Each structure stands twice: as C-alpha cells, then as structure tokens.
C-alpha cells in the first residue's frame, strides 16, 4: 500500500516538473512593456529579463541627459516588475497557490 502511494506521489512530482518546464518556456517567450514619464520612455523585455527594445518619445531629445537616464532606469525597473508579476501569476497557477518561504523560487 505504501509503495503505491509513493509511486503516485513521484508521478505527480514528474507531471508538475513537466508543467513547470513548459511554463518557464512560455514565460521566456512572453514580452512586457515597462513605461516611465507617462509613456515617453518604453522598454520591452522578455520573461527572461532580456531587453528587446527601448523607445524614446521625440520630445525627450530636447531634454537633458540626466532626465533621460532617470526615465530609462525607471522604465527598465517597471518592466522587471511586470515580468516578476507574470512569473508569479504563472507559477502560482501551477503550484495551486502553494506558498513558498520568502526568497525561495520555483523550480527548486
């Protein structure tokens, strides 16, 4: 009886691992757009945190360099935050809302 229960548990773990691998692939293909300055700076980032595109509104070219740098940093940070939200939502759906200890990420 114990053997069957352990086998079933292992099967479930393998299924979850396969689902998580698929979800990670999907997340890597996903793109989000982070914005700053009311959309004057946009950064497109993949789910694996690769920046694909940076867009600057033409009106920024008249402004100072420091402001542009600040807006770029803010847009990148916004994109990172959005990627993390997508990752959390996707992985949370797979784990059935199982709460992990702080700092622990899936997969283990």
Swiss-Prot record:
Entry keywords, A to Z: Cytoplasm, DNA-binding
HAMAP family: DNA_YbaB_EbfC
Functional note: Binds to DNA and alters its conformation. May be involved in regulation of gene expression, nucleoid organization and DNA protection.
GO cellular component: bacterial nucleoid; cytosol
Subcellular localization, as worded in the UniProt entry: Cytoplasm, Nucleoid
GO molecular function: DNA binding
Organism name: Colwellia psychrerythraea (strain 34H / ATCC BAA-681)
Subunit structure: Homodimer.
Transmembrane annotation, as ranges: none
Protein name: Nucleoid-associated protein CPS_3743
Primary location group: cytoplasm
Family membership: Belongs to the YbaB/EbfC family.
Chain segments carrying region Disordered: 87-108
């Amino acid at each position: 009886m114990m053997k069957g229960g352990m086998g079933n548990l292992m099967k479930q773990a393998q299924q979850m691992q396969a689902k998580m691998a698929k979800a990670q692939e999907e997340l890597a293909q996903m793109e989000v757009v982070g914005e700053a300055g009311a959309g004057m700076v946009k950064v497109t980032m993949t789910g694996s945190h690769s920046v694909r595109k940076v867009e600057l509104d033409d009106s920024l070219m008249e402004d100072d360099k420091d402001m542009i740098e600040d807006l770029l940093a803010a847009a990148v940070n916004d994109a990172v935050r959005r990627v993390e939200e997508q990752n959390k939502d996707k992985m949370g759906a797979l784990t059935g809302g199982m709460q992990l200890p702080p700092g622990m990420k899936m997969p283990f």
